[in-house]
Amino acid sequence: IRDVAPSRGLGDVYKRQREHHAEYGALLANDILRRMDMPFTDRATIVSAIGHHDESTGGAVDIVSAAMIIADKTDVRRSRVRSRDKSTYDIHDWVNYAVTEANLKINREKRQIALELKIDEKICTMYEYFDIFLGRMQMCRHGAELFGAKFKLTANGSKVL
């Protein structure tokens, strides 16, 4: 997979845009995993997780998809923004660019998955963050529930979820 997509998601390689990236990623992964002779049941689990990770079309259906969703939706950080030309940024780029620190912590004893963010509010307000990311955080909450855990979100030191 690294040879195919060293720094982009599989779906983004196929379609250089966000629309339908989960579905494209699932199709590409299925082809790659089949060529690697992965057993069908394992391949189906992975492809299903990839196909269900987008907030517009999916949701966690098992613990594998829950793990994928939590990993994907909590991956918010400045280095995700590829362009140096700020005039080309969309709202997703601005939100990612504004996050100066992001830590995902799992506490087994407390059965808690926590995302701690530091957001530069001169770049992106909390309202703008939640306008884009509220649905994603709700997906994380549901994914955490499949693990029997609670999802917590802290932004700039304030408990949000």
Predicted segments — roles?
Residues 1-10, 14:
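Single conserved hydrophobic/aromatic residue that forms the stacking wall/gate
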Residues 23, 27, 45-48, 65, ...:
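A broad detector of short, well-ordered amphipathic alpha-helices
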Residues 16, 35-38, 55-161:
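Divalent metal-dependent phosphate-bond-processing catalytic cores, especially two-metal-ion Mg2+/Mn2+ enzymes
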Residues 12-24:
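Catalytic Zn2+-binding segment of zinc metalloproteases
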Residues 21-36:
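An active-site-proximal "capping" alpha-helix that borders the catalytic cofactor pocket
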Residues 2, 43-51:
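Short, well-structured alpha-helical segments
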